[in-house]
Amino acid sequence: MAMVPSGSGGGPPVIAEVEMNGGADSGAATVRATVVQASTVFYDTPATLDKAERLIEEAAGYGSQLVVFPEAFVGGYPRGSTFGFGANISIGNPKDKGKEEFRKYHAAAIEVPGPEVTRLAAMAGKYKVFLVMGVIEREGYTLYCSVLFFDPLGRYLGKHRKLMPTALERIIWGFGDGSTIPVYDTPLGKIGALICWENKMPLLRTALYGKGIEIYCAPTADSRQVWQASMTHIALEGGCFVLSANQFCRRKDYPPPPEYVFSGLGEEPSPDTVVCPGGSVIISPSGEVLAGPNYEGEALITADLDLGEIVRAKFDFDVVGHYARPEVLSLVVNDQPHLPVSFTSAAEKTTAAKSDSTAKPY
């Protein structure tokens, strides 16, 4: 594993961990992929996008064709905040300070599509990479934790909205539905993503396996050692490469108190306290760790993916193929959007009435 210092200026060096095609099948395609381990510039979306571009440029300089960012990189993951609810959630209004905190968080989120999405698409096109970006999406007054996909031609492909926020995330994020569980068939392979603890949902994983996912992206906020076991299991279960990207951040990467206060930790952490140590990792379909996990700092974690490894792994175990028993166990996925309000146009109502001769008056 080669350790390549970052050439970007400002701040501590970013380290790229690169597995240089060791043991790859020369008869199969190889994809160089990078997972980004870096912190949001909290409450400052333009600065976060500037940082993202520097990191994408650097990864592209190493020859990376696919770049995966952490959960909520654009918009931020609100570590330590309870948005005014305190330790105990109760019926009623949170404190005014919590409401103001949510207003700021809402302002830092992005609309999809929107100008920030246009800029991210331009980055993907400029540096000729497939880009998988974790964002906080704003739709009206509701926020969603989402992943956006872009291709090297500078096109926005689509998104995945987190189906099930975890714990206090449910206070601030809405719930996705089955209409945004995409797997994109790209020249690099079939690429999709689930976010953080969604990856613990067996049926949701199976939906991706059913779509033939080959490069499984797992943006996360979970830095615990046990997360590595989950990532290894998914690689083995799905016969796919798993790319998990998490932020590395210190207290000083968030606004200082009293603007932003870390709750539930007993006392306010010092500026240099690590509040998320990362753990980003790349794992092969055979369960081999190709790069990472890194717990040391901001990093570009890069490996060459030998796509021939997928076929070799599927020979042992194909969860939606020769190892499936659909006459006993099967999965039905509702992939229709679920909207709280739907309108039928007057023209549609008229057409429907004319086509139904048995329609009753109302």
From Swiss-Prot:
<protein>
    <recommendedName>
        <fullName>Bifunctional nitrilase/nitrile hydratase NIT4</fullName>
        <ecNumber>3.5.5.1</ecNumber>
        <ecNumber>3.5.5.4</ecNumber>
    </recommendedName>
</protein>
<dbReference type="InterPro" id="IPR036526">
    <property type="entry name" value="C-N_Hydrolase_sf"/>
</dbReference>
<comment type="function">
    <text>Highly specific for beta-cyano-L-alanine (Ala(CN)). Low activity with 3-phenylpropionitrile (PPN). Not associated with auxin production but may be involved in cyanide detoxification.</text>
</comment>
<keyword id="KW-0378">Hydrolase</keyword>
<dbReference type="GO" id="GO:0018822">
    <property type="term" value="F:nitrile hydratase activity"/>
</dbReference>
<dbReference type="InterPro" id="IPR003010">
    <property type="entry name" value="C-N_Hydrolase"/>
</dbReference>
<dbReference type="InterPro" id="IPR000132">
    <property type="entry name" value="Nitrilase/CN_hydratase_CS"/>
</dbReference>
<feature type="active site" description="Nucleophile">
    <location>
        <position position="196"/>
    </location>
</feature>
<dbReference type="GO" id="GO:0047427">
    <property type="term" value="F:cyanoalanine nitrilase activity"/>
</dbReference>
<comment type="similarity">
    <text>Belongs to the carbon-nitrogen hydrolase superfamily. Nitrilase family.</text>
</comment>
<feature type="domain" description="CN hydrolase">
    <location>
        <begin position="31"/>
        <end position="307"/>
    </location>
</feature>
<feature type="active site" description="Proton acceptor">
    <location>
        <position position="71"/>
    </location>
</feature>
<dbReference type="GO" id="GO:0000257">
    <property type="term" value="F:nitrilase activity"/>
</dbReference>
<dbReference type="InterPro" id="IPR044149">
    <property type="entry name" value="Nitrilases_CHs"/>
</dbReference>
<dbReference type="GO" id="GO:0051410">
    <property type="term" value="P:detoxification of nitrogen compound"/>
</dbReference>
<feature type="active site" description="Proton donor">
    <location>
        <position position="162"/>
    </location>
</feature>
<dbReference type="Pfam" id="PF00795">
    <property type="entry name" value="CN_hydrolase"/>
</dbReference>
